[in-house]
Design a protein with these regions (language model features):
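Nucleotide-activated sugar donor-binding and catalytic core shared by glycosyltransferases
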Residues: 2, 11-22, 37-50, 192-193, ...
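Signal-peptide-cleavage-adjacent N-terminal segments of secreted and extracellular proteins
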Residues: 9-92, 134-135, 141, 155-159, ...
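Conserved catalytic-core segment of nucleotide-activated headgroup transferases in glycan assembly
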Residues: 36-37, 246-247, 261-289
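Conserved nucleotide-sugar donor-interacting segment of glycosyltransferase catalytic cores
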Residues: 40, 111-199, 257-259
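Generic beta-sheet signal
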Residues: 54-56, 71-74, 143, 164-169, ...
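Short gly/pro/ser/thr-enriched loop/turn and capping motifs at secondary-structure boundaries
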Residues: 60-61, 170-175, 278
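Conserved nucleotide-sugar donor-binding subdomain of glycosyltransferases
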Residues: 85-151, 198-242, 246-247
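Long, low-complexity segments enriched in small/aliphatic residues
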Residues: 245-259
């Protein structure tokens, strides 16, 4: 008599496997960011999970279990526009002292506040989103970039599902503190800078100044103002967005230390560099001389 393999016996005791209900919240108007998350959303849906994505850029040819709530038309999508004046017109003194680079670095980040606040002011009254947030989910995925508005709205509607941050690049300067990670500017270059390790003394000095500046800027130019937008719309106080952010369960960053350098991380921040890549094999076209 042949023995019954153990895994066949184990199957008898396995209960039905249920798909997860996943809500994705992506309020940023940059298409390149959404392109980093789409392969993950597609794969989750292909594996049978119930995926609902709130985004400006719904999937084309979505799989069966994927549903999109489009934000298109809610605000202007600036897919191909950039203000080049922030890189022009610097005087000789700024160029000679290197202050022109600092000025440009600061200026190119400032529009992120306008994008975030404009979108947040419209999301608070966006009925399709409020209807979604009244339902129950197993996990909520949301982008961590220039806004905490979705975090606040999830709290307003009493969401209890664990929240997972997604980042299309190395974690932003203001994101690490909420996980208890110290990004020492003496050897951790800003994600948006041109610096690599090791840095010179002047580069470390510039890196430190901008690190402090951007954390303060995000707090006062975006986070507190988004909180005010939410509180004024719903007519009640909510928990500080910074405190809410400390309860996020996990952060997946589309980066890898082989390219971005070694950084101090914790188990709650996981590098998933290359998550945006299409693994489909395609023949390489012949190149003639």
């Amino acid at each position: 008599m042949r023995a019954v393999p153990f895994h066949y016996i184990l199957l008898v005791f396995i209960k039905d496997v249920l798909p997860a209900r996943i809500l994705g919240l992506f309020p940023h108007i940059g298409k390149s960011h959404q392109m980093a998350y789409d392969p993950l959303l597609r794969r989750l849906a292909e594996r049978g999970h119930d995926v609902t994505a709130v985004t400006f850029f719904p999937l084309k040819n979505p799989p069966e279990h994927y549903r999109a709530v489009s934000l298109e038309g809610l605000t202007e999508i600036r897919v191909e526009s950039i203000n080049m004046s922030i890189y022009e017109g610097h005087n000789v003194f700024l160029r000679l002292t290197g202050l022109d680079r600092i000025r440009s670095h600061i200026s190119e980040n400032h529009p992120l506040a306008d994008f975030a606040l404009d979108t947040c002011s419209k999301l608070v009254s966006f009925k399709p989103l409020s209807e979604l947030l009244k339902k129950e989910y197993d996990v909520i995925l949301t982008e961590n970039f220039n806004s905490d508005c979705m975090l606040g709205l999830a709290n307003v509607y009493g969401q209890k599902a664990p929240i997972v941050y997604l980042s299309s690049c190395t974690a932003m300067y203001w994101a690490l503190d909420r996980f208890g990670v110290t990004d020492n500017p003496s050897y951790v270059p800003l994600v948006s800078s041109i610096f690599t390790t090791p840095m010179t003394f002047l580069q470390r000095l510039e890196n430190a100044v901008l690190n402090v500046y951007f954390k303060v800027w995000f707090r006062y130019a975006i986070q507190l103002r988004e909180q005010k937008i939410i509180e004024e719309h719903f007519g009640r106080k909510i928990l500080d967005l910074q405190e809410m952010a400390k309860n996020v369960s996990l952060m997946l960053v589309n980066a890898h230390h082989s390219l971005n350098g070694v950084r101090p991380l914790i188990p709650g921040i996981v590098e998933v560099g290359g998550m945006h890549l299409d693994k489909t094999r395609r023949p390489i076209s012949q190149v003639s001389e």
